[in-house]
Every structure is written in C-alpha cells, then in structure tokens.
Amino acid sequence: MVTSPHTLATEAGLNVLRDGGNAMEAAIAVGAVITVTCPHFCGIGGDAIWIIADRSGRKNVLMGLGQAAEHLPNFQDAIPFRGPASTIVSAGAVDSWEKAHAYSRAHWGGQFGFSLLLDAAIGYAENGFPITASQLYWLDYRKTEVDGWPNFRTTFMPNGRRPREGETFAQPNLARSLKAIARQGAREFYEGELAARIARGLEAAGSPLTAIDLRNTRSTLEQPVSLDYRGLTLLAPPPPTQGISTLAIMGILREFDLSNVAEGSADYYHLCVEAVKQAFLDRARIADPNLVPQPLDQWLAPGHLARKAQSIKLDRAMNWPHPFKTGDTVYFAVTDRFGHSVSVLQSTYYDWGSGIVVGDTGILWQNRGAAFSVDPRSPNVVRAGKRPFYTLNPSMVLKGDAPYVLCGTQGADGQPQTLAVLLTRLLDYRLDPCEALSRPRFLLGKTFSDQRDSLKLEASVNDATVDDLARRGHSIAAIPALSPLAGQAGAIVIHDDGLIKGAHDPRGDGCALGPLD
C-alpha cells in the first residue's frame, strides 16, 4: 500500500509495487514524483528523512539532510525566512534517494534501476500535470511576495498569470535536471555538470552556498530513537530532528489511562495539549549531535517523563508563551507484501522554500537555514558545516519486530502535535486510518498565518468541549474544519492477519492505494 499527498505520486508508487518492486523502490518513485507535483511543499532543493524497517527486525533511519555553508554571512539579526540569506543549507533529498536504492538492493533484493524509478517524475515535469487546488492556495497566499523571488514567476506562473485549477502545468527546466540525475546518478546533483549549474545559479541569486558545499553533502544511515508505548515500540529519527519531542509527548501520555478518557472530549484534548507543552520545554536543546551532546537517555527516561506527567493539572492549562515556526512538507509511506516498510518526509521547510528558483535548473531551493538561531548561547546557533534543527519526524510503530503503523504529517512545529493525536487514535482508540485522520485536530502556538499564541481548534470540535477547554484556561482560537493548518497527514496500519488499511488526509489532495491482488 502507498499513501501520499498527491494521487499521481501514489499511483507511481503503486505501479512499482504491481511490477514486483519493493517498498523502498516504490517510495523513491513516490518521492521523485512529489517533488514535481507538490512544488509548494517539497523539491529536489530540499531534504528527506526515511524510517526503514522490515519483519526481520532490521530498522534504520536515512537522514538526507543538508549542512550550513562553509562561508556564512555575518548574521546580526535573525536569519530571514526568504531570499538568498535563507539559502545557507545544502539539500540532501536526492542523495537520500540513491542511498535508499542501494539499501534496497543490499537488504531487500531490489531489482529496479535507479533511473527507471525517476521516469514518472520526469514525465510529469516534461509533459505537465493538472495543477491542484493546494498549489493554487499557497500561490495565492504568497501573491504579494513572489515578485521579489528570483525566477519564481517564470517557473510557476509561466504565462504571466495565475494558473487555473486543473490546467496543465509543466516544468521543463526541472525535467532536464531530473534527466541528468537519472542518467548520471544522484551525485550528478552534487558533483557533476548539474552541480556546477546549481552552484552558478545559487551564486547569481546571492546565496553563500558553493560547489564545495554541494560536494560535501551526503546522507547518513543511522539508528532510530525508540520508546515503549503500552507494549509497542515507537520509532523516531534522532537529533537534529524533533523526533525526540514526539516520543516524549507519547511517553508523557503513557502515564495516563486513556481507556477512561473519551476520544475527542475536553479531557482528551487537554491531556494532549499539556503533554505537548511539557515535551516542548526540552525541545530548544535539540541540535546537531555531531557538535552538541544530546542526552537522549535523560530526555526519554521514564522518571523524567513521569514527573512531567505529574506536573500536568487536569483542571488547568499551563501558561504557554512559546515561539513556534511553521512549514510545509510532504509525508508518504509504503509497505509491501514482503513486510518491508518505509515512512518518509520530504521538505523545503516553508511553503515555496526560500522562494528562489536556482538559475535555469528549475530547482526551488529550501530555506532550512532559517531554522538556525543566531544566539551564541543556543545549541542550535548557526555554524559552518552544521546541520540545523529539523522539524521533520516521520513515525513508525513496531509490534514485536514487525512494522505495525506508519504515519507522519506536514506542519513543522505542529508535526509532533498531530502525530500525538494520530498515534493515540490509532493505538489507544483503535480507529481506522481514515477515521483517525478525519476527526478534529488542534494546533498550539503561533503560525505564519496567525500570530496569536493560542490553542487553535478546528471548528468541528463541539461547542461544549470548546467551552470546557476555555474554562481550564486555554486561549482558544477557531480555525476551519479540516484546516491545512492542522497538518496534512497519512497513515498505514498493518494488521496481524495481513489486512492493510491506509488513508491520506482529507485536508489535502492525496490518497492511499494498494494493489488488489
């Protein structure tokens, strides 16, 4: 089964499975297509994180992350969210595809050639695809900004106007870049002629990234961080991602007997929100473990999490002035008939990344550099060669050694919040993926579209629950039902009897599909 936020990407992965490919091969095809069909959320100028597991007990995390440029500007103020100063981090997604392909061949008997897995993406870039409501929403949202973004209008508004929903949208320059990667391999992006064109385009745009920074970018295979949750094993990526925060939230909720708490009640939302607050108190310490020690055992120690749970007042909300950032990402997951599973996030950080399309490559570059701090006291302070704090944290749940639940979401700081809701609904309340994804969600804190430091609840939460939460001291702000602000998530559940259920979020354009045979 495949779940992704775009039907064409889901279909590309399904076709690989139908042709005998494994979950990793299908995921590469999905990831490539989605860089074309969801340019507002991700691209080959961004990053990727994969959680990988199979029935044999093998489990890994593939960290396709960039690093800060060797020659950085002297930042006096916060790093900008757009423009050349935000393009200070290289891009790891493409390298992760080839590393995933090698892993598939080495461990899962993969037979598909790397170039073949990019065919569908190249076709949609070259010949076009029907533009979606989601892409137009985010284009409209930034309509007052795009004139200042180099090469943006000519790439995403090629006729000098806003496209119409369903209109065919092609990206010929991106198609040429993808063809070069397919022909020469992923390192073409980092060391070949394409890399030289990328470096020239970045320099022309005013970015500090150079050909040397591209050449130094390599994804790494690491071990996931884990937490026991009611006899199941939750997996998350290690720092510099916020995966540890998701596990901490679940570890705090583990201290409460949710069988006595009605799903969707005021008690349910209150516990989830307060667990998020407690877990996020440690989050500012997350940084690149290559440069800053990360005491994971302390952060996930049962006693530490139990004390956080004990500090939650059931009748009163903790005060919460906390700066959040938000961003846009795509989540997709694949499981196959062999018991192999992958859970993946790809991202350019904010919607439309830095806003800069690099030269004639068609590549929209990420603004992940804006995730760094300029405060010298911060563990996440910007430094040459350092990886910034990453919001990306796909999730996987194991039952015994075998993959049981794959899930993840778009939404930057909202990701651990949405994951806590999804995981409790799937694991504690045994909802199927469609129901778990469709029910109301919340988002705590400021976002780029709402600077109120409030608890945002979807309008589908009933009035009595909203009133109860307000009485407990939560500062409530309503957002529309099925709002994209609450994340665009996906989930697959693999049952013991072989039944597989999957869905993608009704807040987006995607779907889940599986072969009928």
Summary of predicted features, one role per range:
Residues 1-11, 15, 21-185, 189-191, ...:
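Noncatalytic scaffold domains of N-terminal-nucleophile
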Residues 24, 36-53, 58-60, 208-210, ...:
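Active-site rim segments in enzyme catalytic domains, especially the processed small/beta chain
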Residues 42, 47-54, 330-334, 394-396, ...:
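Short beta-strand scaffold segments in enzyme catalytic cores
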Residues 147, 243-259, 397-400, 404-405, ...:
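M16/insulysin-pitrilysin zinc metalloprotease superfamily fold
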Residues 221, 326-329, 390-392:
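Short, small/polar residue-rich loop motifs at catalytic or cofactor-binding pockets
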Residues 235-243, 329-333, 343-357, 408-416:
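Glycine-rich phosphate/pyrophosphate-binding beta-alpha loops
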Residues 255-348, 360-361, 368:
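Internal maturation/activation junctions in enzymes
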Residues 338, 386, 419, 428-484:
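Extended C-terminal subregions enriched in glycine
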